[in-house]
């Protein structure tokens, strides 16, 4: 699994680098587009593509240099949640749950999951549990959810779902893919289910 993740990361990182030059050319060509509506749409598309590339390049860079450390996952979760709208998110997080891992990558994973839920829902519940064999992080929301037949697809890089969790809102198409890669690089697993709120439930299992 680790070898597969490394190969995929190297491939996507290479693609991301290769796409930067044509994107820069496209931005320069926008100056010659006279139709403002077309120019604005193209500019938005280019900006979204740049977000995709930058997010994956940042992930690849962090993954290659960050060392494993023991950190307080409970504290990291609480600190991460505080950056978002408090009226949207409730938590069920016990104190002092420790994890051996790459802290910045785990935070990026959490940010991606919360960002995804916030786009499509009004209420989010984040819970943390520790058992004898693993740590479980659960993110429940009340959004439109993801159809069961699409749940494996959303972990594919650049995959975007039509209609359900909306193509009406911008999505970098890499958030869940990167989250999945981070979890699996820690020897864990990530599953998508229907939440008790009839939205999406994301469950992360991490060994410790």
Model-derived features: where do they sit?
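A residue-level detector for a conserved hydrophobic packing site
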Residues: 106-107
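Acidic ATP/Mg2+-coordinating residue in the GHKL
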Residues: 141
């Amino acid at each position: 699994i680790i070898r597969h993740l490394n190969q995929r990361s190297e491939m996507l990182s290479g693609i991301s680098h290769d796409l930067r030059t044509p994107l820069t050319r496209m931005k320069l060509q926008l100056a010659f587009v006279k139709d403002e509506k077309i120019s604005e749409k193209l500019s938005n598309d280019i900006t979204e593509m740049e977000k995709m590339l930058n997010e994956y390049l940042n992930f690849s860079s962090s993954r290659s240099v960050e060392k494993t450390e023991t950190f307080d996952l409970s504290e990291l979760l609480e600190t991460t949640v505080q950056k978002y709208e408090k009226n949207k998110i409730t938590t069920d997080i016990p104190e002092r749950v420790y994890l051996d891992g790459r802290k910045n990558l785990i935070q990026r994973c959490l940010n991606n999951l919360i960002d995804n839920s916030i786009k499509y829902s009004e209420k989010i519940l984040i819970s943390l549990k520790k058992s004898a064999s693993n740590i479980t992080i659960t993110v429940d929301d009340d959004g439109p959810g993801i159809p069961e037949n699409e749940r494996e697809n959303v972990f594919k890089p650049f995959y975007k779902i039509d209609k359900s969790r909306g193509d009406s809102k911008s999505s970098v198409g890499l958030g869940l893919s990167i989250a999945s890669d981070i979890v699996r690089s820690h020897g864990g697993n990530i599953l998508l289910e229907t939440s008790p709120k009839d939205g999406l439930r994301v469950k992360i299992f991490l060994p410790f």
